[in-house]
């Protein structure tokens, strides 16, 4: 059958149409592929528009299935380079840029000298000092142009967080104000697990960050001002990353915690954050503030040939030096102190930190703070033969060195030294060297960390400001630490940043167990909850069944608020519990007894004059030295080891002679001072009890007589009531005047510490040097209102009429 002729043309007609359709489909598919590629590229390399220009980040997956990916923006500039004329000056905002800036790699770190010999080992975590080779990889790229921050943004929403904007947590790294960088702490895990934006920052360190001449030439505190500038940048730009500028929490450990504490007291940071987490360090620690900045600046100037008499010329000379020459100078401060750190400049830090706390300068912030069980490990770790415990000689030397470096007054040292040894001797096991080692660690822990933290918590909570206190009692298993060590300084850091969830790293080379993973999840939940609501218990409950089949004991624990009366705190460990009055006896010793030891010293002198036994005759000890009535201690020398304790000098046991007598004398210990301490304390307590009972009896007897004479309240007229009130006010004023006169009369012969009023801060931070301590506002700056005086910097944005006269202090931010 033949095909119709017209149908022969159909294939020819449809061929162009098919070609056209295929071309359109191909173009559509190509466009779709390009679109998906762009979307994928945007997801892989997200771009954010800041106030200074666009930046490109990097989307990074995490090696744990329970953790979502995180967007990282690394090396974002928050200030102009502090170089040239900007050295030793407050930071300035960064310059804008065009195009898209790549922020996928870390920027340079601030100059520092990681030398084994120059590090303040006692104030640094073990994971820091034991990994200097690893740390060198983080700080190889050094430059004065170092004011950058790193931003870690989670990509998954939190069903518990009703606010579309995410809370922001800003970490201020530690390192004794001399070392460290925000680059070495990865905030990805904390950001992903807690659904918060985590930011780490670099700030100027050491000489470049804290040099001060004590006057207008170089005020100091540039590192603190860098942190404040970073917070200002965050307030302006974090909204572009999905962050909430009204929910910013700053947190830090060690020197970083002290910076956090100081920022809560500075008006320059007002409104830039709302909450603070202070881990193992406050502004009240002996190493938190440098009270002799001009002294160390002069030492530096001598070393580099800038010892000009005029401080302005000296600073100009230092400004023209190469930064490497400056940071390589070794300037060693007294133990427990710092050479370059925050100073009381009358501006950024307007007064002594304790005075500012007492005035309520930090009450507008919610605060969570705490300590680790064995913070003072590094102070004891260097003692010879500490693996087998601490010998009596080493114990005596450590206490003597401790007193000599912290308390600069010549009189009363013997009393203080013996009292400290008395308090930190386990009398039930006093001959055990391991027990002696444990109590020595406790001594340094209590003085340097626990007492300052409790004092800070008391001052913050006394008016009802939200305060939470913790004690960290866990640490990972690592070869970096001795087997006998407890949770030491900085041991909480890997748990805060979730390191156990991804396994050991070069910096935290621990053998993490499931318990470590569980505890890290618990800690991150507490920390991020506090950042979200100010309450570590809300909104996310403690639930770690996805990590550990065992029940999470933290589910049954509610972290209670801290108050000065109950002093409740959370014991963070594998057996959590809420307890009260953390190390109350030892804290009271440092906060209450030590500031008043000069009163007890007078009692000791009275007891010694009435019960003194005549000293032995010198002729009785032909080869020994007669013990003086007042025991004389060496200032820094280690007590000599007697021949009886030194095998190298042991003698024949059958040999007799004068040497045997010498050994016998030197191995004896005189407990007269301890006995005097005990008698004096007992006598003073008895005397106080007698006074209390006498006062109680007198008031009771007086009240009984007055009930017969006093008219009923209804018969008192208004004038009578007003008269009584006036008399009470006048009585209080007279008592205050007598109190002031008493304080003035004590100043002339005070040996240890004034009792009016008790000053815990300076008691802990007395300097041993001959140069007098800087009193608060000693280096307060010349007012800017003087003729020809230009404003020091652009940070002062507070108007003179901004403060309320109803606040506790003329410039207070106290919550009323």
Swiss-Prot record:
Tissue expression remark: Expressed at highest levels in heart. Expressed at lower levels in liver, skeletal muscle and pancreas and at very low levels in brain.
Disease: Autism, X-linked 2: A complex multifactorial, pervasive developmental disorder characterized by impairments in reciprocal social interaction and communication, restricted and stereotyped patterns of interests and activities, and the presence of developmental abnormalities by 3 years of age. Most individuals with autism also manifest moderate intellectual disability.
Disordered as annotated region, ranges: 636-659
Protein name: Neuroligin-4, X-linked
Cleavable signal peptide: 1-41
Assembly: Homodimer. Interacts with NRXN1 in a calcium-dependent manner. Interaction with neurexins is mediated by heparan sulfate glycan modification on neurexin. Interacts through its C-terminus with DLG4/PSD-95 third PDZ domain.
Effect of mutating residue 214 to S: In a colorectal cancer sample; somatic mutation
Species, as recorded: Homo sapiens (Human)
Upper classification of the organism: Eukaryota, Metazoa, Chordata, Craniata, Vertebrata
Recorded name of the encoding gene: NLGN4X
Chain's role: Cell surface protein involved in cell-cell-interactions via its interactions with neurexin family members.
Gene3D superfamilies: alpha/beta hydrolase
Residue ranges crossing the lipid bilayer per the database entry: 677-697
